[in-house]
């Protein structure tokens, strides 16, 4: 824009100058000679344009023959040739010359139609696109590589245009930028048998809820692991201690010792969540720090009894945001950056669930009370699976998505088998359907949970594809 003002001012001074500063020979200030265009354009009768066209080749005033265009800043609009590629003839006063306007026409200047700077492949910043194109033509004349446009704006790190669409409407990116520093990657280690060597066995995500290092995650992420390591967004790693676990609700609290204050995430009110709201799931799947998925809330009250997730008194948040093993334990947030749930499991494509933030608040309050009073808790039996109750409608939906899904309409559908657990050792696999244990029929996932509490050995019959397989699993006792 500054260049345009300068160019127009130069033209004005040129037109108001003394007679000694006349226009080029043969060009009058007004009443230019009429350009006579042929009735029909015959390109074969056009003179070949010069090979050296610094302003680029353009069509003549009749739109027929190729000619060399005038350079930026050249006089135009009278008897001169047309402006070069990307340039337009700007007349500060009066009207430009045209096929119908000649006598009252005024001279103008060739000005670039694009006024913003651009960065070229030669790492130079050009005032506008036209100057870059001129530089590219000069480079090609010298048999050098052409200069191409790398980006709008100056080379190097520029400032984002506040009026751009991506600045106005990228609200998801704003949320991620706000919450990412408080999201952590969790790595789990276990010692090899008959060896002191430790190996990573699983990973997950979590989020910081206190400035002194308290972190919330899923219970299944940290349960039954010898050592827990936490990595912050800046790459710093810390050993973590497990402070409290509610294996039934699948919530855990761990703690790292960190000097200074840590960024934290605040809990929102999941009771105020509405179906259709945008949500963002963030975590570290496959050990990739802060991978983001987005979606909407499908329903806010998917009952625990319906899902069979071992907590019949809790309603889960269902979302189509992608949740997997890696971002399990990470936060599900609203557009205000408030945590409204913990990413907990994916059933199939487009169907994932999160533990509501109101349940997290209850867990944190009860955990505080337990630690303040020094209460002890009894051990719980654990086999290491995540499951849901299978209904006829859910079975039909899964069969539509997976052709090899077992031909059953009830039972406990295994969503995940956690590595290095009794379930894995016994031979259970994802997508198995438990149909009986110790001779008792299994209709829901709650049936499995009840038997685990009572029995020391589980003789299971599972439907895998079209086969019934007998599997023995021995639960182990763990700290809750």
Curated annotation (Swiss-Prot):
Disulphides: 37-62, 41-64, 46-65, 53-68, 76-89, 83-110, 112-130, 119-155
UniProt entry tagged with the keyword Cell membrane: yes
The PDZ domain, residue ranges: 365-467
One Gene Ontology molecular-function label: identical protein binding
Signal sequence interval, chain numbering: 1-22
SMART domains: IB, KAZAL, PDZ
EC numbers on record: 3.4.21.-
Chief site of localization: membrane
Cited Gene3D superfamilies: 2.30.42.10, 2.40.10.120, 3.30.60.30, 4.10.40.20
Any one GO cellular component localisation term in the record: extracellular region
Alphabetically ordered keywords of this record: Cell membrane, Cytoplasm, Disulfide bond, Growth factor binding, Hydrolase, Membrane, Protease, Secreted, Serine protease, Signal
Domain of life: Eukaryota
InterPro entries linked to this entry: Growth_fac_rcpt_cys_sf (IPR009030), IGFBP-like (IPR000867), Kazal_dom (IPR002350), Kazal_dom_sf (IPR036058), PDZ (IPR001478), PDZ_6 (IPR041489), PDZ_sf (IPR036034), Peptidase_S1_PA (IPR009003)
Assembly mode: Forms homotrimers. In the presence of substrate, may form higher-order multimers in a PDZ-independent manner. Interacts with TGF-beta family members, including BMP4, TGFB1, TGFB2, activin A and GDF5.
Entry similarity comment: Belongs to the peptidase S1C family.
Comment block on domains: The IGFBP N-terminal domain mediates interaction with TSC2 substrate.
The protein's name: Serine protease HTRA1
Encoding gene (name): Htra1
